[in-house]
Amino acid sequence: MEDPNRMMAHTGGMMAPQGYSLSGQDDGQNTGNENEVRKQKDIGEILQQIMSISEQSLDEAQARKHTLNCHRMKPALFSVLCEIKEKTVLSIRNTQEEEPPDPQLMRLDNMLIAEGVAGPEKGGGGAAAASAAAASQGGSLSIDGADNAIEHSDYRAKLAQIRQIYHQELEKYEQACNEFTTHVMNLLREQSRTRPITPKEIERMVQIIHKKFSSIQMQLKQSTCEAVMILRSRFLDARRKRRNFSKQASEILNEYFYSHLSNPYPSEEAKEELARKCGITVSQVSNWFGNKRIRYKKNIGKAQEEANLYAAKKAAGASPYSMAGPPSGTTTPMMSPAPPQDSMGYTMGSGGYDQQQPYDNSMGGYDPNLHQDLSP
Protein backbone atom coordinates (compact mmCIF):
# COMPACT_ATOMS: atom_id res chain seq x y z
CA MET A 1 0.00 0.00 0.00
CA GLU A 2 1.34 3.35 -1.08
CA ASP A 3 2.28 6.13 1.28
CA PRO A 4 -0.41 8.84 1.51
CA ASN A 5 2.25 11.55 1.50
CA ARG A 6 3.61 10.30 -1.77
CA MET A 7 0.12 10.26 -3.27
CA MET A 8 -0.53 13.85 -2.22
CA ALA A 9 2.78 14.96 -3.64
CA HIS A 10 2.01 13.22 -6.90
CA THR A 11 -1.45 14.74 -7.05
CA GLY A 12 -0.14 18.22 -6.33
CA GLY A 13 2.42 17.89 -9.09
CA MET A 14 -0.23 17.01 -11.62
CA MET A 15 -2.59 19.83 -10.56
CA ALA A 16 -0.02 22.54 -10.84
CA PRO A 17 0.18 22.68 -14.67
CA GLN A 18 -3.62 22.76 -14.93
CA GLY A 19 -3.81 25.78 -12.66
CA TYR A 20 -1.15 27.60 -14.69
CA SER A 21 -2.96 27.09 -18.00
CA LEU A 22 -6.21 28.66 -16.72
CA SER A 23 -4.40 31.72 -15.50
CA GLY A 24 -2.86 32.29 -18.98
CA GLN A 25 -6.27 32.22 -20.72
CA ASP A 26 -7.64 34.88 -18.39
CA ASP A 27 -4.71 37.18 -19.10
CA GLY A 28 -5.27 36.87 -22.89
CA GLN A 29 -8.96 37.72 -22.60
CA ASN A 30 -8.21 40.73 -20.44
CA THR A 31 -5.65 42.00 -22.95
CA GLY A 32 -8.16 41.66 -25.83
CA ASN A 33 -10.83 43.50 -23.89
CA GLU A 34 -8.44 46.31 -23.08
CA ASN A 35 -7.51 46.69 -26.75
CA GLU A 36 -11.18 46.82 -27.73
CA VAL A 37 -11.93 49.44 -25.10
CA ARG A 38 -8.92 51.51 -26.18
CA LYS A 39 -10.01 51.27 -29.83
CA GLN A 40 -13.55 52.42 -29.03
CA LYS A 41 -12.14 55.26 -26.95
CA ASP A 42 -9.98 56.40 -29.85
CA ILE A 43 -12.98 56.32 -32.21
CA GLY A 44 -15.01 58.32 -29.70
CA GLU A 45 -12.29 60.92 -29.45
CA ILE A 46 -12.12 61.21 -33.24
CA LEU A 47 -15.87 61.64 -33.49
CA GLN A 48 -15.78 64.24 -30.74
CA GLN A 49 -13.11 66.17 -32.61
CA ILE A 50 -15.17 66.01 -35.79
CA MET A 51 -18.27 67.27 -34.01
CA SER A 52 -16.34 70.13 -32.46
CA ILE A 53 -15.14 71.42 -35.84
CA SER A 54 -18.29 73.52 -36.29
CA GLU A 55 -17.66 75.21 -32.94
CA GLN A 56 -14.06 76.11 -33.68
CA SER A 57 -13.03 79.66 -34.38
CA LEU A 58 -11.48 80.63 -37.69
CA ASP A 59 -8.00 80.82 -36.17
CA GLU A 60 -8.33 77.34 -34.64
CA ALA A 61 -9.56 75.94 -37.93
CA GLN A 62 -6.67 77.49 -39.84
CA ALA A 63 -4.20 76.10 -37.30
CA ARG A 64 -5.62 72.58 -37.58
CA LYS A 65 -5.67 72.86 -41.36
CA HIS A 66 -2.02 73.89 -41.38
CA THR A 67 -1.18 71.00 -39.06
CA LEU A 68 -2.93 68.56 -41.38
CA ASN A 69 -1.20 69.89 -44.48
CA CYS A 70 2.21 69.62 -42.81
CA HIS A 71 1.63 66.14 -41.42
CA ARG A 72 3.93 63.48 -42.80
CA MET A 73 1.04 61.07 -43.35
CA LYS A 74 -1.04 63.45 -45.46
CA PRO A 75 0.09 62.00 -48.85
CA ALA A 76 -0.87 58.54 -47.61
CA LEU A 77 -4.26 59.84 -46.48
CA PHE A 78 -4.88 61.50 -49.87
CA SER A 79 -3.88 58.29 -51.67
CA VAL A 80 -6.28 56.22 -49.59
CA LEU A 81 -9.12 58.68 -50.23
CA CYS A 82 -8.44 58.48 -53.98
CA GLU A 83 -8.65 54.70 -53.88
CA ILE A 84 -11.90 54.81 -51.94
CA LYS A 85 -13.40 57.33 -54.35
CA GLU A 86 -12.49 55.24 -57.37
CA LYS A 87 -14.35 52.32 -55.85
CA THR A 88 -17.44 54.09 -54.56
CA VAL A 89 -18.01 57.30 -56.50
CA LEU A 90 -20.62 57.39 -59.24
CA SER A 91 -19.19 57.95 -62.67
CA ILE A 92 -19.91 61.39 -64.12
CA ARG A 93 -21.04 61.47 -67.71
CA ASN A 94 -18.24 62.37 -70.03
CA THR A 95 -20.57 64.21 -72.38
CA GLN A 96 -22.17 66.96 -70.34
CA GLU A 97 -24.65 68.40 -72.81
CA GLU A 98 -26.09 71.77 -71.97
CA GLU A 99 -29.72 71.64 -70.98
CA PRO A 100 -32.13 73.47 -73.32
CA PRO A 101 -33.39 76.81 -72.00
CA ASP A 102 -36.62 76.80 -70.07
CA PRO A 103 -39.50 77.66 -72.46
CA GLN A 104 -41.41 79.48 -69.73
CA LEU A 105 -38.36 81.62 -68.98
CA MET A 106 -38.00 82.40 -72.69
CA ARG A 107 -41.63 83.54 -72.89
CA LEU A 108 -41.15 85.82 -69.91
CA ASP A 109 -37.99 87.30 -71.44
CA ASN A 110 -39.75 87.96 -74.76
CA MET A 111 -42.64 89.69 -73.02
CA LEU A 112 -40.34 91.88 -70.92
CA ILE A 113 -38.40 92.88 -74.03
CA ALA A 114 -41.61 93.66 -75.94
CA GLU A 115 -42.88 95.85 -73.10
CA GLY A 116 -39.55 97.68 -72.86
CA VAL A 117 -38.79 96.44 -69.34
CA ALA A 118 -35.83 94.27 -70.33
CA GLY A 119 -33.36 94.67 -73.14
CA PRO A 120 -29.93 96.09 -73.89
CA GLU A 121 -30.94 99.53 -72.69
CA LYS A 122 -32.34 99.73 -69.18
CA GLY A 123 -33.98 103.05 -69.99
CA GLY A 124 -35.96 101.61 -72.89
CA GLY A 125 -39.67 101.13 -73.13
CA GLY A 126 -40.60 104.41 -74.78
CA ALA A 127 -41.46 102.70 -78.04
CA ALA A 128 -43.62 100.12 -76.28
CA ALA A 129 -45.45 102.81 -74.38
CA ALA A 130 -45.98 104.85 -77.54
CA SER A 131 -47.32 101.88 -79.49
CA ALA A 132 -49.64 100.92 -76.64
CA ALA A 133 -50.87 104.49 -76.42
CA ALA A 134 -51.51 104.60 -80.15
CA ALA A 135 -53.43 101.34 -79.95
CA SER A 136 -55.57 102.73 -77.15
CA GLN A 137 -56.72 105.54 -79.44
CA GLY A 138 -58.09 103.06 -81.98
CA GLY A 139 -56.22 104.71 -84.83
CA SER A 140 -57.98 108.06 -84.48
CA LEU A 141 -56.79 111.53 -83.58
CA SER A 142 -58.48 112.62 -80.37
CA ILE A 143 -59.33 116.23 -79.68
CA ASP A 144 -58.50 116.04 -75.99
CA GLY A 145 -54.82 115.60 -76.72
CA ALA A 146 -53.85 117.18 -73.44
CA ASP A 147 -55.72 114.53 -71.44
CA ASN A 148 -54.21 111.79 -73.56
CA ALA A 149 -50.73 113.20 -73.07
CA ILE A 150 -51.25 113.27 -69.31
CA GLU A 151 -52.43 109.66 -69.23
CA HIS A 152 -49.59 108.55 -71.48
CA SER A 153 -47.08 110.31 -69.26
CA ASP A 154 -48.58 108.59 -66.22
CA TYR A 155 -48.33 105.25 -67.98
CA ARG A 156 -44.71 105.86 -68.94
CA ALA A 157 -43.89 106.95 -65.38
CA LYS A 158 -45.44 103.80 -63.90
CA LEU A 159 -43.70 101.65 -66.50
CA ALA A 160 -40.37 103.31 -65.72
CA GLN A 161 -40.93 102.60 -62.03
CA ILE A 162 -41.61 98.93 -62.74
CA ARG A 163 -38.54 98.77 -64.96
CA GLN A 164 -36.36 100.35 -62.26
CA ILE A 165 -37.56 97.94 -59.57
CA TYR A 166 -37.05 94.99 -61.92
CA HIS A 167 -33.45 95.89 -62.71
CA GLN A 168 -32.67 96.59 -59.06
CA GLU A 169 -33.99 93.20 -57.99
CA LEU A 170 -32.29 91.49 -60.92
CA GLU A 171 -28.98 93.06 -59.95
CA LYS A 172 -29.43 91.85 -56.36
CA TYR A 173 -30.22 88.37 -57.64
CA GLU A 174 -27.14 88.25 -59.87
CA GLN A 175 -24.94 89.54 -57.07
CA ALA A 176 -26.22 86.95 -54.58
CA CYS A 177 -25.84 84.15 -57.12
CA ASN A 178 -22.27 85.16 -57.99
CA GLU A 179 -21.26 85.52 -54.34
CA PHE A 180 -22.65 82.13 -53.39
CA THR A 181 -21.09 80.46 -56.44
CA THR A 182 -17.69 82.00 -55.72
CA HIS A 183 -17.88 80.90 -52.08
CA VAL A 184 -18.68 77.30 -53.04
CA MET A 185 -15.92 77.18 -55.67
CA ASN A 186 -13.32 78.49 -53.21
CA LEU A 187 -14.48 75.97 -50.62
CA LEU A 188 -14.22 73.07 -53.06
CA ARG A 189 -10.78 74.17 -54.24
CA GLU A 190 -9.62 74.34 -50.63
CA GLN A 191 -11.02 70.89 -49.90
CA SER A 192 -9.39 69.48 -53.02
CA ARG A 193 -6.05 69.80 -51.22
CA THR A 194 -7.22 67.16 -48.75
CA ARG A 195 -9.70 65.04 -50.69
CA PRO A 196 -9.86 64.38 -54.44
CA ILE A 197 -12.16 66.83 -56.29
CA THR A 198 -11.95 67.15 -60.07
CA PRO A 199 -12.62 70.37 -62.03
CA LYS A 200 -15.60 68.69 -63.71
CA GLU A 201 -17.16 68.09 -60.33
CA ILE A 202 -16.72 71.75 -59.43
CA GLU A 203 -18.31 72.80 -62.73
CA ARG A 204 -21.21 70.45 -62.15
CA MET A 205 -21.76 71.92 -58.69
CA VAL A 206 -21.83 75.43 -60.21
CA GLN A 207 -24.52 74.30 -62.67
CA ILE A 208 -26.59 72.91 -59.81
CA ILE A 209 -26.32 76.23 -57.95
CA HIS A 210 -27.39 78.23 -61.01
CA LYS A 211 -30.34 75.91 -61.54
CA LYS A 212 -31.45 76.45 -57.95
CA PHE A 213 -31.17 80.21 -58.33
CA SER A 214 -33.07 80.20 -61.65
CA SER A 215 -36.33 79.61 -59.80
CA ILE A 216 -35.83 82.95 -58.03
CA GLN A 217 -35.16 84.64 -61.36
CA MET A 218 -38.30 83.14 -62.89
CA GLN A 219 -40.40 84.33 -59.96
CA LEU A 220 -39.01 87.86 -60.35
CA LYS A 221 -39.78 87.96 -64.07
CA GLN A 222 -43.24 86.47 -63.55
CA SER A 223 -44.19 89.11 -60.98
CA THR A 224 -42.82 91.87 -63.24
CA CYS A 225 -44.89 90.66 -66.20
CA GLU A 226 -47.99 90.58 -64.01
CA ALA A 227 -47.32 94.14 -62.88
CA VAL A 228 -47.00 95.31 -66.50
CA MET A 229 -50.25 93.61 -67.51
CA ILE A 230 -52.09 95.17 -64.58
CA LEU A 231 -50.71 98.57 -65.57
CA ARG A 232 -51.89 98.13 -69.17
CA SER A 233 -55.37 97.08 -68.09
CA ARG A 234 -55.73 100.04 -65.73
CA PHE A 235 -54.43 102.77 -68.01
CA LEU A 236 -54.76 101.76 -71.66
CA ASP A 237 -57.39 99.05 -71.91
CA ALA A 238 -59.80 100.83 -69.56
CA ARG A 239 -59.20 104.07 -71.40
CA ARG A 240 -59.97 102.43 -74.73
CA LYS A 241 -63.30 101.18 -73.40
CA ARG A 242 -64.55 104.35 -71.78
CA ARG A 243 -63.43 106.94 -74.36
CA ASN A 244 -64.93 106.54 -77.77
CA PHE A 245 -65.34 110.26 -78.45
CA SER A 246 -64.47 113.37 -76.51
CA LYS A 247 -67.12 115.63 -75.02
CA GLN A 248 -66.49 118.26 -77.69
CA ALA A 249 -66.91 115.72 -80.49
CA SER A 250 -70.18 114.50 -78.96
CA GLU A 251 -71.45 118.09 -78.82
CA ILE A 252 -70.69 118.63 -82.50
CA LEU A 253 -72.35 115.40 -83.61
CA ASN A 254 -75.44 115.85 -81.43
CA GLU A 255 -75.91 119.43 -82.58
CA TYR A 256 -75.76 118.41 -86.22
CA PHE A 257 -78.15 115.52 -85.61
CA TYR A 258 -80.84 117.64 -83.95
CA SER A 259 -80.32 120.49 -86.40
CA HIS A 260 -81.11 118.08 -89.25
CA LEU A 261 -83.70 116.01 -87.45
CA SER A 262 -85.99 115.96 -90.48
CA ASN A 263 -83.25 114.26 -92.49
CA PRO A 264 -80.58 112.90 -90.12
CA TYR A 265 -78.50 111.47 -92.95
CA PRO A 266 -75.46 113.68 -93.56
CA SER A 267 -73.91 113.70 -96.99
CA GLU A 268 -70.39 112.51 -97.65
CA GLU A 269 -69.15 116.11 -97.64
CA ALA A 270 -70.87 116.73 -94.29
CA LYS A 271 -69.38 113.53 -92.87
CA GLU A 272 -65.90 114.59 -93.92
CA GLU A 273 -66.40 118.01 -92.34
CA LEU A 274 -67.71 116.47 -89.12
CA ALA A 275 -64.83 114.00 -89.03
CA ARG A 276 -62.34 116.84 -89.45
CA LYS A 277 -63.88 118.89 -86.64
CA CYS A 278 -64.26 115.94 -84.28
CA GLY A 279 -60.86 114.45 -85.02
CA ILE A 280 -62.30 111.05 -85.94
CA THR A 281 -62.71 109.04 -89.12
CA VAL A 282 -65.58 109.20 -91.61
CA SER A 283 -66.56 105.62 -90.82
CA GLN A 284 -66.84 106.52 -87.14
CA VAL A 285 -69.12 109.41 -88.04
CA SER A 286 -71.33 107.06 -90.07
CA ASN A 287 -71.47 104.54 -87.23
CA TRP A 288 -72.34 107.24 -84.72
CA PHE A 289 -75.27 108.54 -86.80
CA GLY A 290 -76.55 105.01 -87.35
CA ASN A 291 -76.53 104.27 -83.63
CA LYS A 292 -78.00 107.68 -82.84
CA ARG A 293 -80.95 107.16 -85.19
CA ILE A 294 -81.67 103.79 -83.58
CA ARG A 295 -81.55 105.22 -80.07
CA TYR A 296 -83.74 108.15 -81.13
CA LYS A 297 -86.41 105.84 -82.50
CA LYS A 298 -86.38 103.57 -79.43
CA ASN A 299 -86.74 106.40 -76.92
CA ILE A 300 -88.47 109.24 -78.73
CA GLY A 301 -89.51 111.08 -75.54
CA LYS A 302 -86.05 111.36 -74.06
CA ALA A 303 -84.61 112.24 -77.44
CA GLN A 304 -87.15 115.06 -77.81
CA GLU A 305 -86.02 116.54 -74.48
CA GLU A 306 -82.43 116.41 -75.68
CA ALA A 307 -83.47 118.07 -78.94
CA ASN A 308 -85.19 120.90 -77.04
CA LEU A 309 -82.02 121.35 -74.97
CA TYR A 310 -79.90 121.82 -78.06
CA ALA A 311 -82.58 124.11 -79.50
CA ALA A 312 -82.36 126.29 -76.39
CA LYS A 313 -78.59 126.45 -76.76
CA LYS A 314 -79.05 127.43 -80.37
CA ALA A 315 -81.48 130.19 -79.44
CA ALA A 316 -79.18 131.53 -76.72
CA GLY A 317 -76.25 131.89 -79.09
CA ALA A 318 -74.51 130.18 -81.94
CA SER A 319 -72.41 127.26 -80.77
CA PRO A 320 -68.74 127.39 -81.68
CA TYR A 321 -68.98 123.73 -82.65
CA SER A 322 -71.79 124.12 -85.19
CA MET A 323 -71.45 123.71 -88.92
CA ALA A 324 -72.31 126.59 -91.23
CA GLY A 325 -75.43 128.10 -89.65
CA PRO A 326 -78.54 129.12 -91.53
CA PRO A 327 -78.72 132.67 -92.86
CA SER A 328 -80.57 135.27 -90.83
CA GLY A 329 -84.30 135.39 -91.25
CA THR A 330 -84.64 131.71 -92.14
CA THR A 331 -86.34 129.12 -90.04
CA THR A 332 -84.57 126.07 -88.68
CA PRO A 333 -86.00 122.66 -87.85
CA MET A 334 -84.30 122.72 -84.46
CA MET A 335 -87.52 123.60 -82.65
CA SER A 336 -89.69 121.34 -84.77
CA PRO A 337 -91.39 118.44 -83.05
CA ALA A 338 -89.98 115.03 -83.68
CA PRO A 339 -91.38 113.38 -86.81
CA PRO A 340 -93.64 110.40 -86.35
CA GLN A 341 -91.98 107.04 -86.25
CA ASP A 342 -93.24 106.19 -89.73
CA SER A 343 -91.40 109.21 -91.21
CA MET A 344 -87.87 108.63 -89.91
CA GLY A 345 -86.78 107.24 -93.25
CA TYR A 346 -85.57 103.84 -92.04
CA THR A 347 -86.89 100.59 -90.62
CA MET A 348 -85.30 98.48 -87.96
CA GLY A 349 -86.09 95.22 -89.68
CA SER A 350 -84.70 95.89 -93.15
CA GLY A 351 -81.70 97.96 -92.09
CA GLY A 352 -82.27 100.40 -95.00
CA TYR A 353 -84.80 102.80 -96.50
CA ASP A 354 -88.47 101.97 -96.62
CA GLN A 355 -89.90 102.52 -100.09
CA GLN A 356 -93.09 103.95 -98.54
CA GLN A 357 -91.25 106.49 -96.43
CA PRO A 358 -90.91 110.12 -97.56
CA TYR A 359 -87.32 109.68 -98.81
CA ASP A 360 -86.86 109.56 -102.52
CA ASN A 361 -83.92 107.25 -103.13
CA SER A 362 -83.93 107.86 -106.86
CA MET A 363 -83.41 111.61 -106.31
CA GLY A 364 -80.83 110.97 -103.55
CA GLY A 365 -82.51 113.46 -101.23
CA TYR A 366 -85.62 114.48 -99.42
CA ASP A 367 -88.93 114.81 -101.28
CA PRO A 368 -90.87 117.76 -99.79
CA ASN A 369 -94.08 116.65 -101.48
CA LEU A 370 -94.19 113.44 -99.45
CA HIS A 371 -93.42 114.95 -96.05
CA GLN A 372 -95.47 117.09 -93.75
CA ASP A 373 -94.13 120.61 -93.26
CA LEU A 374 -92.87 120.79 -89.68
CA SER A 375 -91.83 124.42 -89.72
CA PRO A 376 -93.60 126.63 -87.19
UniProtKB/Swiss-Prot annotation:
Region of interest (Disordered), residue spans: 16-35, 318-376
Pfam families recorded: Homeobox_KN, PBC
Subcellular location per the Swiss-Prot or TrEMBL entry: Nucleus
InterPro entries (alphabetical): HD, Homeobox_CS, Homeodomain-like_sf, KN_HD, PBX_PBC_dom, TALE_homeobox
DNA-binding region: 238-300
Subunit comment: Interacts with Ubx and hth.
Ranges of biased composition (kind: Low complexity): 318-335
GO biological process: anatomical structure formation involved in morphogenesis; animal organ morphogenesis; eye development; peripheral nervous system development; regulation of transcription by RNA polymerase II
GO molecular function: cis-regulatory region sequence-specific DNA binding; DNA binding; DNA-binding transcription factor activity; DNA-binding transcription factor activity, RNA polymerase II-specific
SMART domains, per database record: HOX (SM00389)
Stretches with biased composition (Polar residues): 20-34
Annotated family: Belongs to the TALE/PBX homeobox family.
Leader sequence segment: none
GO cellular component terms attached to this protein's record: nucleus; transcription regulator complex
Keyword Nucleus appears in the UniProt entry: yes
Region (PBC-A): 45-124
Residue span of region PBC-B: 127-237
Protein source organism: Drosophila pseudoobscura pseudoobscura (Fruit fly)
Main location: nucleus
Disulfide bonds: none
Keywords: Developmental protein, DNA-binding, Homeobox, Nucleus, Transcription, Transcription regulation
Domain PBC as annotated: residue spans: 38-237
PANTHER family in alphabetical order: HOMEOBOX PROTEIN TRANSCRIPTION FACTORS (PTHR11850)
Listed name of the protein: Homeobox protein extradenticle
Function: Transcription factor which acts with the selector homeodomain proteins altering the regulation of downstream target genes such as wingless (wg), teashirt (tsh) and decapentaplegic (dpp), thus affecting segmental identity. Delimits the eye field and prevent inappropriate eye development. Required for proper localization of chordotonal organs within the peripheral nervous system.
